[in-house]
Design a protein with these regions (language model features):
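Short, electropositive alpha-helical surface patch
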Residues: 86, 90, 94-103
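Short, hinge-like loop/turn segments at secondary-structure boundaries
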Residues: 28-29, 100-103, 126-130
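A glycine-rich helix N-cap at a beta->alpha junction
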Residues: 100-117
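Conserved phosphate-binding/catalytic loop of the ribokinase/pfkB sugar-kinase fold
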Residues: 109-113, 121-130
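Short beta-strand/turn micro-motifs composed of small residues
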Residues: 13, 86-88, 126
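Glycine-rich phosphate/adenosyl-contacting loop at the front of the ribokinase-like
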Residues: 2-83, 92-95
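Short catalytic-loop micro-motif centered on adjacent basic/acidic residues
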Residues: 83-86, 109-110
Length: 130
């Protein structure tokens, strides 16, 4: 993880892949969710991610507060001004995050976990509710 560049901003946090799909009250009830709420996913919520992608026209969006901040800052600052550090799984979701950061010109240093998947955030959009 050595770098020859001089970065003005370091962002460090767990990266997330936001999986945003349009659902309804029935989907919320299936997983014990409420509109406009946020929870830490438990075992009974794990199938939601795949269901959003397969049945609810999900969009995959690079997320996580620090990673979003890093991409936004890199947009405003000169090239190679921002570096982001986080941990992801060795999976396709990590590749999605890497691609988004590369497109934003963001230098990214990920640690790859062989056992745990990349962090995900399931978002069920119902009308104006998230």
């Amino acid at each position: 993880m050595s770098s020859t560049g001089k970065f003005e901003l370091l962002c460090l946090e767990n990266p997330l892949l936001d999986i945003q799909g349009t659902g309804d009250e029935k989907l919320l009830q299936k997983y014990g969710l409420k509109p406009n709420d946020a929870i830490l996913a438990e075992k009974q919520h794990m199938d939601l991610y795949q269901e959003l992608m397969e049945k609810h026209d999900a969009k995959l969006i690079a997320g996580g507060a620090a990673q979003n901040t890093a991409r936004g800052a890199q947009y405003c600052l000169p090239p190679d001004s921002v570096i982001y550090i986080g941990c992801v799984g060795k999976d396709e979701h990590a590749k999605t995050l890497e691609k988004a950061n590369k497109e934003a010109g963001l230098k990214t240093c990920y640690r790859y976990d062989e056992e745990q998947p990349t962090g995900r955030c399931g978002v069920v959009i119902t009308g104006h509710n998230r």
